Structures are given as C-alpha cells and as structure tokens.
Swiss-Prot record:
One of its GO terms (cellular component) is cytosol. HAMAP family: 16SrRNA_methyltr_G (MF_00074). The gene is rsmG. Specifically methylates the N7 position of a guanine in 16S rRNA. S-adenosyl-L-methionine binds at residues 73, 78, 96-98, 124-125, 141. This is Ribosomal RNA small subunit methyltransferase G. PANTHER family: S-ADENOSYL-L-METHIONINE-DEPENDENT METHYLTRANSFERASES SUPERFAMILY PROTEIN. It comes from Aster yellows witches'-broom phytoplasma (strain AYWB). It is an enzyme of class 2 (transferase). One of its GO terms (molecular function) is rRNA (guanine-N7-)-methyltransferase activity. Belongs to the methyltransferase superfamily. RNA methyltransferase RsmG family. Its EC number is 2.1.1.-.
Length: 212
C-alpha cells in the first residue's frame, strides 16, 4: 500500500477515491492477462507511470472549472479515468480505436460507479465532424507526433478551450516541427511543464494549448 499512500498524500485523495485506485489497479492487472491492455503492469509502474502521470495534470490546470473532458486514444483509461475519480463532476468522452479497450473501460466505469462517461469506438480522425468545437478540454497521451495530434485534436476543442499533449522529455524537437501547424490552427502554447516521476521512473512534459 506504500505506493497508494504516496498518491493519497500527493493528491489529497479521500478514502473512497483511494479505494477506487486500488480496485483500478487490481482490475487492470486481472484483465491485462486476457487482453494485453498495457505493458506497464507492476504496482510501481501503474501507480506512478499511469496514475501519478495522469493526476499531475491538476497542477497545471484547475479542472474544477471544466465541464467536459475528451480523452483521445485513452487506452486503459489514462488520463481521463484517474481525473474522473479525482473530479467526479467531469463528463468524460472517450475516443478509442480498440474495441477491447472500450469494453474494458465500460466494465471499469461500472465497477467504479463512474457516471457520465461516453465512449466512441473509432479513430479520432473519423470522429463526427459535428462534434468539432464541442469540448472544454481535450487531452492526448503518448498518441502520436505533436504535429499530428494537433491536427486531430484541436478541431474538437471549443473556442477558448484547452488541449494538453502529454509528452516525454524530448519534446523540444516535436514542438519546433509543429510551429507551422500551431500557427495554422490558431492555438497558442500556454505552458510547457516538465516534471520527474517518483523513483526516477522518467521525465514527462505536459504541453498546454489554448484555442483562439
């Protein structure tokens, strides 16, 4: 429980939230044996490379003022499900191309009693254009090169809304290569937050953009 206690202390989790993260880990570990949801399945990896990495977004943005969050390429639910546990008021929209991951997330949402979660089984570039400009906040974690995910994700963001690209430590080259598309899509880089995961498990960068 040491890893979970560190999450509790860092992110001020209550007992109910902490229990949900414990269940999340156990359910992910169990289902991963059947369907290969993630290669990072040790307790330390899940707690820090998945849960911590997701929850740290609260340090660069106040999600209390966000109504809906669209997670593009959510995989096993990161970062949207940890954020939903922390901020139960959020409406979560999942866009995921893998049906097995969608089915896993539907089961997990039911077990965790997470309401107001919508699922779209499709690639983001196939998402209904009528949904463009619908979302307060869009996030993509380790999905593709920055210039590609900007093209995919920015159209989903409402006017004056936000998009976060979750990247590793070598983000500068991608950012440089994306200057043209950033200008074309009329978004501005608000912040680039670099942080270290606990136990020297890696460096992460969260790039926060705002639409005009």
């Amino acid at each position: 429980m040491l890893y979970f206690e560190s999450l509790k202390d860092k992110f001020k989790l209550n007992k109910k939230q902490l229990n949900k993260f414990v269940f999340y880990y156990e359910f992910l570990k169990k289902e991963n044996q059947k369907m290969n949801l993630t290669s990072l399945i040790s307790l330390s990896d899940v707690c820090y490379k998945h849960f911590y990495d997701s929850l740290i977004l609260k340090e660069i943005f106040d999600f209390n003022n966000v109504t809906n969050l669209c997670d593009v390429g959510s995989g096993a639910g990161f970062p949207s499900f940890p954020l939903k546990i922390l901020y139960p008021h959020l409406k979560i929209i999942i866009i995921e191309s893998s049906l097995k991951k969608i089915n896993f997330l539907k089961q997990l949402a039911s077990h965790l009693e997470l309401d107001n979660v919508c699922f779209f089984h499709k690639r983001v570039e196939q998402h209904d254009i009528a949904k463009n400009g619908s979302y307060d906040f869009v996030v993509a974690r380790a999905l593709a090169r920055l210039e590609i995910i900007l093209k995919w994700c920015v159209p989903l963001v409402k006017k004056r809304g936000y998009f976060i690209a979750m990247k590793g430590k070598n983000f500068q080259q991608e950012l440089e290569a994306s200057k043209k598309i950033i200008k074309q899509m009329k978004v501005k880089l608000v912040s680039a937050k670099v942080f270290e995961l606990p136990m020297q498990l890696g460096t992460r960068t969260n790039l926060l953009f705002q639409t005009e």
